[in-house]
Each structure stands twice: as C-alpha cells, then as structure tokens.
C-alpha cells in the first residue's frame, strides 16, 4: 500500500509544492499540444522555435544559454524541428546556423494564442493583486534558483 508523504517527512502542502513544476509542465503540455497538434509538434518545441525566431542564425550552444535544457535535449529538439521542416541549418560542419522556415514561422505566430490559453486556463481565477504577488514571488524564486545553479557549476 502506498505510504503518505508524511511518512517521508513532508506535509501534503510541502509535497504539492515540490511537485508543482511537474504539474505545471504537464498542464502547459496539455494546452500547447492541443494547439500545435495539426502542425505535428509538441508544446516544448515552441520555446526553441521562439529563440530561433528572436535570434535568427543562432547555434545550438547559444540556445542553451536562453533555455534551461541540457545539451542533449536541445540537440534532440532541434533535430525534430529540422526533420519536421520547421527549421533549416545553413551552416556546414560542426557549427550550426538555425533559421525558421515558413512552417516554423507559422508555429511561432501561434504564441499569442498559447499565451491567451495559458492565461485563461491556469490563471483565469486569480485577481490582479494575486497575480502581481505570484509574479513577484516567482521573480525572487527564479533569482534564487539561478544563484544555486551558478554556484554549483
């Protein structure tokens, strides 16, 4: 029989907090995957497409500086985007110079719709004051997480 989180020293609220990022990722995937299903991509592709859109000609190593994916994850996502015709690589050899195709631009053009759906589905029940407080808290939390990551590299 499964044990409760109390048996491991966590209250249910603490356990929910620990698993919050996983739940948020799952819900973002549900929303995004529906929106992008007809294009044949998943929601996680959008972040890489957005970076390429914002930095035309970027290489994979530089994408890692913007998105917190590891090297192999970036490589797999870029390969999927290349294979799907969303991105082209104009460089030769080991370096890369990534550019969006029309298909990639079409996916990026759906960003406002994705943002709207996320805002409505996830944050629609919050007041402006609650959203402001949450955003300020996440800014502080993100800063602290970055400090921990940087001090351990």
Predicted regions and their residues:
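N-terminal leader segment of winged-helix/HTH proteins
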Residues: 1-39, 86, 97
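Hydrophobic structural patches
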Residues: 21, 49-52, 138
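Alpha-helical linker/hinge and terminal dimerization helices associated
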Residues: 24, 28-31, 67, 107-125, ...
